[in-house]
Amino acid sequence: MGHKATVELVLDCEEPKRLAKFWREALDYRDYYTDANLAVLVPKEGIASPLLLQAVPEPKAGKNRMHLDIVVDDIEAEVHRLQALGARRIDEGVQSFGGTRWVRMSDPERNEFCVSTGIEW
C-alpha cells in the first residue's frame, strides 16, 4: 500500500483573526474555526489545502523560506484586487522564468506570496 499524505498550510502571524480576513477574501475561502490564537480557513468549493493562521509571540524576521503562489490568468488585475484588500507589492514589474510570470507581494503582516501564471505541467 502506498503512502498517502495531505498538506495543511500554516502561516505564523501576530493576529490570526485580522489576517484571516485578508486571506479569506484573497483565496475565496470560508471560516472553519477561529479563536484568539488560531484561524482555520477552508475552500468554499472544490478540493484545496486548508490555511491555518497561527499566533506566535515573536515578530516576523527576514524573508519567508516558503511562500504561497496564487495562480491566475490576469496577474495585474489580481495584484490590484489584492492591494485593495491590504496586500503590498514588493517588486515593480512582472518577473518571468521558463514561461512562468509572477509578481511578489506581501500580506498585511508582511508574509510574502506571489501572484503567478503558474507552471504548465
Regions found by a protein language model. Give the residues of each.
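Vicinal oxygen chelate
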Residues: 2-14, 32-33, 40-42, 49-53, 57-82, 101-106, ...
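Amphipathic alpha-helical segments
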Residues: 15-30, 82-84
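Short alpha-helical
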Residues: 18, 48, 77
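Intrinsically disordered, low-complexity boundary segments flanking structured domains
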Residues: 27, 36-42, 54-57, 74-75
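Short, solvent-exposed loop/turn segments that connect beta-strands within catalytic domains
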Residues: 45-48, 61-62
